[in-house]
Each structure stands twice: as structure tokens, then as C-alpha cells.
Amino acid sequence: LQFLMTRGLRIPPHAKAHAETVVHTFERDVILYSLMPHAHLRGKAAKFTAAFPDGREETLLSVPRYDFNWQTVYVLNEPRPLPAGTQVKFEMVWDNSAQNPANPDPSRAVPWGDQTWDEMNAGWI
């Protein structure tokens, strides 16, 4: 299990599409079985991408309409071998605007926090 996160997260007030990316490089061969993105009420989209040592890139998971109320572990149909040197990039996008009906306060700069009114950029692989 590998946990990817941005602890210094700070989403500006009224930002409609604030994005942060976390990258992890595997030092040895691994087998990927599942992925799970996690954010709170302002989460808008999530994406995991593999950048292989030979330069190829592959989308592992794309969640274009993230919903806090539908948190799930996405299990791959087939386990995916990732060779040593592969980078997994986890990108989360948040909507801190008034157009987000779930947003409790668009005028607030939102930090990392465990409470639902704060935010997280957390991905498990």
C-alpha cells in the first residue's frame, strides 16, 4: 500500500479548478491491484497516471466527476505490473467556487484537514 498526499494543501478562495499533483517513484517492481482517490466536499476530479521508465505514459484511473458521497476503491480488472522506476502521478482538482453546490464557504482559503469542511489530497495505490 502506498499513500500519496499533499499536506501543505491550500486552495484559494473562489478557485473553480485548483489542481495539485503528487508523484511517487517505485524503486522496485510492483504489482498494482487497486486505486482510491480521496477528497472532501470541494473535490471535482481525480486522475492516476503511470509514467514508465521507457517514456510511455498510461492513465490508470480517471474520475472526471469526483463525488465525496461516492468513495470507493477502484479494483483493476487485471493486476498491473509496474517496473522499477515507474512514477505514479496522482492529480486532484477541487472546485472552491460558488458554483459548487456542496461547497460550504467559497470565500475561504481551504487548508488540508481531517474535517469535511477542510480538504484532502489523498490517493491510495
Give residue spans per PLM region:
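His-enriched metal-coordination microenvironments in redox/metal-binding proteins
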Residues: 1-125
